[in-house]
Amino acid sequence: MFLVYLRNCMDFFFNSSFNYSLTSIDFYKTIFLIFANKIKNNFLYIISFQWFFNITYIINQLPSIDDELYIPIVRDFFNFNSLITYIYNISLTQIFSIFSFSAIHVYFIKRLYSENLTSILPALSGYFISEILFIICIYSGITNLFIILANWERFFIISGIIFFFYEGVNFIKENKNKNIYLKIPFIKHSTFFNSYRFFNFKEFFLGVFLFCLDSPSIFTLVSNLSLTPTVSNFEFFINSSFIQLVLFILIRSFFFYLSFIIIYPFILNKIHHNTYFQSDTLKKINIFIQKGFGMLLIFFSVSSIPFYTIEYFLGYLLGIIPKDISLFFTQLDPYFLSDSPGFYEQFYYGNTVVPFKAAKFDRGRYLLYPAYRELPPSYEDFIFKPIYLEWTKTLKSNNYIDRYLGSQKTTMQYIQTKATPIIKFFENLFPDANVRKSNKRKKILTQLLTDKFLGSHTKLNTYFNVPYAEKLLFFNRLSKSAFRINNKQYYNDLILSSIEEFVTFNENLIPNFETLTPFDKCTYRFSLSKNLLTSRLKPFVDFLDLFSAPEFDITPIYVKMAENILSTYDRKKFFAPLANFFKDETLNESKVKKKNAQPSLSREIEAIQGKIPLESILTEGIVALFPEWAYIKMELVGKLGSIIKEYQRYFNFLEIFNLYLRGHSFKLTVKQSIDLHYRQLYQTEAISYLRHYFNNNSYRKIRDDLDNFSKVLKINFIENTKNKTNKIKNLNTREDSKKLLISLEKDSKKFMKYLLFKTTRSFASKVYNHQFKGTLIDLIQWFSYSPYTSSMFKEINTKEMENVFIEAEEPSYLLSLNNDVKKYYPIIKYDQAFYKKDALDKGIIFDHILYKSLIEELYDDDLTLENSESLKNENKLSKKNLSLINSNIISPNQNIFDLLNMIIDYITITNYSLSKIDTLLNPFIEYMSFEPLCASNHNNLFVLSTAHYSINDIDLPVKNHNTNKWPLPSNILDYLVYNISDDKVSFKNPLAYIGMFLQIPYEKFGIDYKNTYIFKVDNYEELNEHEVFDQYMDFFARYEDPAYESLQLKFINLFLENSLDDTNKALCKNYLFSKNFMVPTAYIDCPFPILQHFYLAKNLRQLFFVRSPIRGGYKWAGSYTNNIINNKLYTDLLKIYNRIILLWHKIYTSIIYKFKRNNHGTLAQLVE
């Protein structure tokens, strides 16, 4: 983050030889700064065995904020001649650097102890006044001083050397026959105010000259405060007040002065008079110290310690120098690669303008380097192989680049095509900006948008496109032109028109978009528009906000956006219930369009206060406009995954509705209850919500409600639940189990009613309850024992529940249910595109008509829904094969592994389709989740049968199930490798092995296919990671394919993702290297999650998904790695998730039944 910020931090301080220097700015930052005065940090290269002579000229692009810094490996590795040459050069450099830097110390020390304290006051005054003026000039943007110092650096170095020897020789001569006795000088008032030397302008200008000599070191402070070309440091710079700067300089000057009058003489006095120095040998040392060079070394060493320690300590306290500097190596000079040699007429380096020169580089590109630096003499011989070259080589070996992006030119065309609406918007945005050439602007804007289109985690945006610096140059030039925004409406209209173009552009990418329901169209358009504003256009909106006076208000854009979206629908129909509610019969479409239309605000106030059921009115209006909402009411939504999706859809539309009313002066809001941040927090990060729930102050209200819950239900309920909990261990018959579950269901209803209604009665509170506590309620339902919840069966009597429970043993039980029961059955409706009411009534989950049209876009004409089953029966596997889920419904009380096995029999989506799916549905796929492709009855995925589990058992192996350790037995491996003939399957790419487990005749090897479960046995003792890893590698080696070369790296990197926290990383490692790997019966490589629960937890989701190196974002893990490794990965992660689910099941069961040990515990204690 602070890479560029630190690059010029020590530039002039260290780099007298015009070379790079690397400095460690981390835990030992201060120590490195101390010794950097004497030992040049280029020695770090020698320590790291990188002593190539020209390694100091590392050429690298200016990295973006999220990029890592890579140090290339030099060509002459362990070359002795290069080592000698390198040491020779930096040694000479170091000697001259020491002499130049020490000049000021020699002068001040000589004057201080040869005469008195006041003799150096004029020089000190000139020195510090020069320093303050210099920093003020830099702070104010006066950049000429920087250029002067850069161009005269050699002169100051030579002057410093001459001055050093001149003053040093005089000092030795003057003290040759004197016994130097150092005292701590004190300031005498008469001497201080009356000394003529205080007004000695000759000494004053000598101090100014000493500042110039010391400018390489003083530039350390300046560079810390200067504006550097990164967004983060720009924010840091404008937040640093000028008072802080002046205060820092004054305190720094005081300690600098204090170190001369107290620290140095005190130390030297102790050395001189210590009896330990009276031996003959040490007397000689003492004599040497009294001579010039010996004193210089001591003064030089001691001076840097208090000076820089105090300086950086004060910088920490004042907040000027950042505290969280985490980089270990830092580059100090900007070198860039560009396709255009003349683009960099000037570049803002810090707060200064630095001219750049261009030199020919390879592949028609140009090396741009600062004009005040010399071109490396042998730059053409550099080993310019950063990581991205090796990385692209690996990708090309697997045909990923050709498949997804093609050549560099194709990539740029692809980005420019996708960014056309926004580029058009930007090109018309700044008519008065100081950037006029359209080609340059298009190049800048393309790069500006590349990070968002290709993803923020990919390196392609850095190396396949224009340098990052061009984007910064664009904004810097705008800022230097004192740009101000006056006509806000003009920019509002531009943004809205751009959004409309962008939405229309993306709608055309979605197949069969017109077949979507009006509700899905509406919410999709709004989500896409809001995403555009909050992510892809956020830098621009922030820029408008920064340069507009008063602040740029984005609310009118949202309001207008919502109005445009709603304008495509029948507003009379929608607002009719609302008009009746406000008793304003004249509220119709014509009046809504008038700006002055205002309903009765008193009725609005009553609604917000909860006196009128406004929420029901809103629901009525939504249902009137979108009839399908009558079919999906909130109380009918089942498990957590579906309620997340439905809440998202519901609140997205509610936000549109709210913004529309706000634009028409209704001022009807749901306050902060549907704020975007909290909605995302609670709806899309369920497990994170559970984890933070116990320790975050913002959830105190919910936590207090839960604590009060025990008081409301009183002791009787607690005792009853305790007894019921104990009965679980003694269940003997299915009838006992059934009765207990029904009883527990009633208790759960009490708990849910308490959470829903035991609150304030305002409308905002009701939304709060539905949104936040409603999520908690579904979590409790999810982890309760009962396979049925109140959200599933609204008003079903006990007899009906008994019948359903008994019939649940039949796989096709749902088809035999009567209509009264079926209408309450919670079909999970993630996306309307895959559902139709008629199909649902028939028990079919998906809209095959729409899905079939999607398939025809992706696959051959002869491979459609009708013949997919015949392909399966013929035991043929094609890399274009796609078998859809049939209409069988999974029993609600079936184990999750049964569900997995049944799904595997019906769906196989190969990696071949991924590129087309990703292209056609992006960014549509960001809005719509395709979990329904592989899910049936999600409401009961994690209902745990009491026949196998109890609340006290987290890891219980399923009895009477055959398991096999990983790797697979050798006979099965041989079968896979040799017995699958080429005439049936052509494995040109190892990804085509996906689904081959479906063809294994398990019965032939004595494996019970139906009873082979993916389950984990809790045995982690005597863990041998290396042995297991070798087994993996041996297994990979059985297949001779070039793509396996990168498997090991991908395999390791998957578990070294920086985004994983330590807990998940350790948990993954335990499962990964466990000795008890279970063999999955089959595996699916699919661009979508197979099961609904994969979507729930953000941290766990990062385990199931890998970051795509092509477009960024999360993709199914099987998309970019081999199916076999994912086969194992999927198995392990499924077991990890199962373990966590069981753990939370235990926790929430304990919550429902109160706390086992006592009745006074807290939830935090329970979790501990």
Curated annotation (Swiss-Prot):
Q: What transmembrane ranges does the database entry give?
A: 43-63, 89-109, 132-152, 155-175, 203-223, 247-267, 293-313
* Keywords from the UniProt entry: Membrane, Plastid, Transmembrane, Transmembrane helix
Q: Does the keyword Transmembrane apply?
A: yes
Topologically, how does it sit relative to the membrane? Multi-pass membrane protein
Q: Name one GO cellular component term.
A: plastid membrane
Signal sequence range:
none
Indicate where this protein is primarily found: plastid
Q: Where in the cell is it found?
A: Plastid membrane
Family the entry assigns = Belongs to the ycf78 family.
- Identify this protein by name: Uncharacterized membrane protein ycf78
Give the source species: Helicosporidium sp. subsp. Simulium jonesii (Green alga)
Give the classification, highest ranks. Answer: Eukaryota, Viridiplantae, Chlorophyta, core chlorophytes, Trebouxiophyceae
